[in-house]
Regions:
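Glycine-/small-residue-enriched transmembrane alpha-helix faces in small-molecule transporters
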Residues: 1-39, 78, 145-172, 191-192
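Hydrophobic alpha-helical transmembrane segments of multi-pass integral membrane proteins
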Residues: 7-12, 37-56, 71, 129-132, ...
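Specific transmembrane alpha-helical segments of multi-pass solute transporters/efflux pumps
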Residues: 20, 58-97, 103, 111, ...
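Helix-loop interface residues and adjacent transmembrane-helix termini in multi-pass membrane transporters
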Residues: 32-33, 93, 119-121, 175-176
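Specific alpha-helical transmembrane segments that line the substrate/conduction pathway
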Residues: 37-48, 88-119, 159
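Hydrophobic transmembrane alpha-helices of multi-pass small-molecule transport proteins
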Residues: 50, 54, 80, 122-142, ...
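Loop-to-transmembrane alpha-helix entry segments
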Residues: 67, 100-103, 119-139, 146-153
């Protein structure tokens, strides 16, 4: 699995976006399932895939890597798990297009958080992009007041915000392997689903 680290970032980003675009279709296919049931099912399969990835990648060092991530890994996992919840809730309360657009504003929040937290300068291009993104969100949220999807759009905003916070945590802990944070996010999400699901019967 070490070959993944050699793949250009933009290719991984495009592939991630492609996979994410199917999220709405999968979530909407469970018409009778509650938000927490969907979260539990989604997180369970996520955990299975991730455990396989970790074992193949780190082999006998898997447990050590998970421990070495420490509090930063747990905090990053908790923050990411909140994004998982927001994604499922948003997808069931507003359009897929709205959710995907709002998620795409993550770069805006990264620039803002980076400026205040990491003291990174914001270029003119980034500043203009932030203004355009904010304008788009304002128009979208304003329209949703009459369409009844305001709550879904508002929850969707938590996704790019939490992911940006996660990036800040990762940047602040460059000396740590933060892949375990993804593992912990799956654990948190499964726990949420187990506690809050009324039943474990799924209807597609």
């Amino acid at each position: 699995m070490q070959f993944l680290y050699k793949i250009p970032g933009y290719i991984l980003l495009l592939f991630g976006g492609f996979c994410l675009s199917w999220g709405g279709f999968v979530i909407r296919s469970f018409e009778e399932a509650s938000v927490w049931q969907i979260l539990l099912l989604r997180s369970s399969f996520f955990m299975i895939a991730l455990i396989i990835f970790l074992i193949i990648t780190y082999k006998k060092n898997t447990i050590r890597v998970l421990k070495d991530a420490g509090f930063a890994g747990l905090l990053g996992g908790f923050v990411m798990s909140l994004s998982f919840i927001a994604f499922v809730v948003a997808m069931t309360n507003t359009s897929v297009a709205n959710v995907v657009f709002i998620i795409s504003t993550q770069t805006m929040f990264l620039a803002i958080f980076g400026y205040f937290y990491l003291k990174e300068k914001v270029s003119l291009v980034s500043f203009i992009s932030i203004l355009l993104a904010m304008s788009g969100i304002t128009i979208m949220v304003g329209d949703s007041l009459t369409s009844g999807s305001f709550f879904g759009n508002l929850v969707a905003l938590a996704i790019p915000i939490n992911f940006s916070i996660l990036v800040m945590i990762i940047r602040k802990n460059k000396n740590l392997d933060m892949v375990p944070a993804i593992f912990y996010s799956g654990i948190f999400s499964v726990i949420y689903g187990l506690i809050l699901s009324e039943s474990f019967v799924f209807t597609s």
